[in-house]
Amino acid sequence: MSALVSPAVNSPRPMTNAELDRLSINCIRTLSIDAVQQAKSGHPGTPMALAPLVYTLWNRVMRFDPQDPIWPNRDRFVLSNGHASMLLWSVLHLTGTRAVNADYERLGQPAVSLDDIRHFRQLGSKAPGHPEYHLVSGVETTTGPLGQGVATSVGMAIAEAWLANRYNRPDFEIFDHNVYAVCGDGCMMEGVGSEAASLAGHLALDNLCWIYDNNHITIEGNTRIAFTEDIAARFLGYGWNVLRVGDANDIERIEHAIFFTRPRTARLSSFWIVTSAMARRISRTLLRPTASRSARRRSASPSATTDGQRTPNSWFPTRCAPISPPASARAARRPAPVGPNCLPLIARNIPNSRPRST
């Protein structure tokens, strides 16, 4: 665990942006794996692998007020692969999200305290193995059955589109929030997700973004055992804007992807494919493939080069944009919500963190 902790914690100088990002991400990771270890049950792989992605979404992209988690125009975050719930509990704790009861009354206490995380997956805990709606503030929907979360996110996007059409006026937008859903291989295998994706493409829901963690690992082994279809081609057929982001650990690359497929400018639902390098390393270790089998897999891959390395976007049609945002992309970032934003809160809740250097 000590290898995951940034050496900048004990440094006398102010932390740089990159160091603070790394410390925040590693804090999410270590909090998640400690909770799983304490419970002797759970799924640590996805929280470790997707911590950079979720940190980037919550810290740089989403509009969300931790002091008012029921703000009607907040961006929605759906963790469709709900077995990775420690990823969500860690973020809700570190952002300081406040609790709201069933009557939507603000209680003034943390939605997820450190003590709740200590009792992860225990009877009566506010940090169960799968997110449950109305039990914890910040949970937008119950996710357990794979595919259910992404399907529900389509309904959320439809609801926002209806509200915007009904209540918005020129130069006075009341509803313009977006819906972000994180999903995995299991969600892509489920029929309910395919049906919902088809509907979203038909309706051209430009306020919806699915982020697919393409880590090639299941509880039974590599996904090649039962799942070899071309996901990108499927979603292009649905009419989505498809983008291969690449390494889920590259937060700058993830943020750049926002400005190519950011909702309302892409005019289509967006589907990102990210690769959890950490999870894929675990997969290769568990499967222990021989050199000949690895070579055969690389040669059979439609996106493999002669040296066996994948070329980003090489198996996608030209409509999929590369990751090279225009210079004006950052200036086009949507405004922060009314009230305090969650941007600095993850770092603020990490012990011994120091202000960013200017």
Regions found by a protein language model. Give the residues of each.
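An alpha-helix initiation/capping motif
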Residues: 26, 47-52, 82, 251-252
